[in-house]
Structure formats: structure tokens, C-alpha cells
């Protein structure tokens, strides 16, 4: 078995907006954030968003494409250490919906997926002139009450959407995928979540997931609390 490669701290990029090119909104640092469905702060109040440098480059180029069309990329989450993943799985809403933790999972166990490697990013768009978020049909992190009832509105295959919503989702996909091509990367738009873009599992599985213990104290993310 080939050992996983360790991601160097130097390979993590602070997504600080890059002089207004995009906006970072650390949803999980605030228990009261309207888009934080978990009911507790998964991250410290002063947490920032980080991405692996290769995905950060994709986001920067996607943001440039969006800006040329009068839109702003809105980054919601990136690196999600294993401790934060554990808090997610222990949250009241996850315990209410144990099916979310069963494959095909909506909430990954600690260490699984692109987020604990900084190789997945959650994004949306807003109009630069009006400051209004584009209608994507659902909010960010909209999970189904019944996962087994069929395709739900946040899923990319859900078709009972207005033409405007379909166009907005296609616009976001276009910016992110063109950004990836520019950087020589291959990006997976996660089927179940219109906001999630990541490297393919064949790529992310080569790297060890990140724990807060792997990070310098000043950039650690996870909140020292419980969601129970």
C-alpha cells in the first residue's frame, strides 16, 4: 500500500479575498449564521478559509472570469479539518438524519473527501452591481429531509427549476470549470451539491487528510466545543 503524501502547510493558501476579487464568508465560524444548518460553530470565531494552492489557483481564475461579467465569486468553505468533520457528524441535525451519514453520504466521516485536504471548495455568486446573490434554487448547504425520496433541489440532476436558476447554476459551473482548464486541472462538480467543486477522488486519495494538530496554532480552524 502506497503511503499518502502529507500536505505541507506552505501549500495551503489563505483565501482572503485577494483585494476584492472574490468574497470569503466563513459560514461555519458562526453558530447564528443563517446558512449554518448545524446549529453550532464548527470553526473558531476568527477562522479563515484555506485551500490547497492548486485549487486556490482555480478559484482565482474563476473569480476573474466572473468579475469580467459583473459577478463576484462568494467562497463559503474550503479546508475542513477532521475535527470539524467530526463535529458535523455529531450535530443535532446530523443525528436527526442518520441517513445523511450513509453512502451516498451528504456528511463525510472524518478524513474522507476533498474538504479535509483543502481540495474541495463551496462557492456561489452574487451580482456585483446590486449585491444580490444569484438565485440557485436553494441556499448553500440545503440538505433534503428525506434523502431516499429521490433527487432533491440542490442536486445537479434536479430539473424542476426555473430557467433563470438553471442559467445561474450553469454560469457558476462554467466559471469554475474554465478556471480549472486554465490551470491544467480537472474539477468534479459534486453531483449532490450545486455549490461544491473538488478534485476527483483518484487525486485527493493520494494525500493524507489534515487535522488541526497538523496546522500552526494561528491558522487552526476547528472550534473547541461540541455540537451535541
Predicted regions and their residues:
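Segments that shape or occlude catalytic/ligand-binding pockets
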Residues: 81
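Extracytoplasmic cell-surface/polysaccharide-interacting catalytic and binding patches
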Residues: 1-76, 88-191, 200-228
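Conserved metal-phosphate-binding beta-hairpin within the catalytic cores
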Residues: 197
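Active-site lining segments that contact anionic ligands and/or coordinate catalytic metals
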Residues: 194
